[in-house]
Structure formats: structure tokens, C-alpha cells
Amino acid sequence: MRIQVENLWVAFKNKVALREVYLDLFGDGAQVVALIGPSGAGKSTFLRLLKGMVKLSGGKVWVDSLPLHEGQRDALQQLRRRTAMVYQTFQLIGRLTVLENVLVGRLPHMSPIRGLFKHFSVQDLAKAEKLLEEVGLLEHAWQRADALSGGQQQRVGIARALIQEPALILADEPISALDPKNAKVIMELLLGAVRRQGIPLLVTLHHLEMVRHYADRVVAFKEGQVFFNGPLSDFTSEKEKELYFGEKETHEASEWFSSTLMV
């Protein structure tokens, strides 16, 4: 899996969300790349573009050699099969069971004429049950998804992404709606799964300590542009301060920043 971006622009009406973006990701052997930056910097837009949910306005993008900039329907269909998304707000279907929500991840691989849940294969069902066991929710398989806690729902989201057997997982702030204890559990589950299966992970995070603990590489966005792109060892505290507070740092900002490093 490799993501290549050349002079990417994305605009919505009169607002430019991404501009002059150049990136080459996962070609260096990194498995976990963290996207960071202030709110509204373009991180989520970039992820949704890679999932085929947002159209580019200019430039070129290749995902696993698929040319997204050409706008071909076949390329988009392949992209949706090869990429899986873990969302911030879980995106489960509350009236369906936990097992059925996991099976939703198999839909990109199914022909429309097969219908939905009546025609999943025995192999699909076995995979779903195995994944639910791995995330600690097998006993809840036939429970409605809307009866689960937030942390449990995100576990279902991870299982749904993994059953798709993707070449790339995109995670859009997967722990921002969780308390610190559940956030750590979810990150351990997600990172453990992708490392066992050798799946690259592109994840947006606001928890700086988790970036340091889990990421191999960091891409920082600021005002729609790439502010930093490189190994975690090169992303210094000075760069973090400049990213979030600019060149002129107030005393209050310095105290807040220092406190985040201690979390």
C-alpha cells in the first residue's frame, strides 16, 4: 500500500479545505501514520478523500496505484473495497444487532443482487464472530447496537473495519469521544489488530502522548497545508508549539501545552 499526493486541492464552495498538498505515505515501511493539527486544518477532509467520500478540486492522488484524480467509477469502487474507515461517532446502525453491524463491512465485496443479511456466507459469519471475540463482544453478538456503551460501539467499528479485509484502514479521531481509559483500550485493540495483520493505518489524533506512543510517522496539517511530514523523532516540541500556537507563544499557551505532554 502506498499513497502518493501531488499538488492536491480540495474546495467546498468558497472555502479551500486543502491546498498544495504533496505527500508520499507508507512507501518507507511506516505502518502507523498519525495526522495531527488544529481543528479545521484539513485532516478529516484528507481521510474522506482517500475513502472516496470527497472529490478533489485539483492535483493528483494515487492510492495503491488507483488514480483518484481521473474520477473513474471502477477506481472508486476498488478504493472502497480496499479501504475501511473507523469513525469518531461510531456510525453504527442502532436497530441492527452487533453481529449485523460487523457484517456491514462485507458489503463492498458483495454483488448487489445478493441482497443484504440473508446471503452472507458461512465464512463471513465465522469471521464476524471471531472478530467479535477478539474485541471482547462475542456475548453481545445478538444485542442491538444502540444498547452498547460508547467504548463498546467503537469496538464494533473496529471489527467492522477488519472484516472488510482492507489494504488500508483510515481512522478519523477514533478515541476523541471516549474517556481516557476507554481511549487507551481502543487504541491498543486497533493497533494490535493492524500490526498482527500487517495493515497500514492512517489515523487522526489530538492526544499527543498517544501519537508519541503509537505512530511511526507524523503528518501535521495547518490551514489546509502540510506543516510537517516526517518520522516521529524529527517532530520536536518546538514544532508542536509552532503548529498549535504559531511563532509567538504566550505564557498561558506554554503552560497549557506543557500540561498536555504530562497527560
From Swiss-Prot:
Q: How does it assemble?
A: The complex is composed of two ATP-binding proteins (PhnC), two transmembrane proteins (PhnE) and a solute-binding protein (PhnD).
* Organism in which the protein naturally occurs: Synechococcus sp. (strain JA-2-3B'a(2-13)) (Cyanobacteria bacterium Yellowstone B-Prime)
Protein name per the record: Phosphonates import ATP-binding protein PhnC 1
Ligand binding (ATP):
G37, P38, S39, G40, A41, G42, K43, S44
> What residue stretches are annotated with the ABC transporter domain?
3-248
What membrane topology does this protein have? Peripheral membrane protein
Query: What EC designation does it have?
Result: 7.3.2.2
Q: Which EC class is this protein assigned?
A: translocase
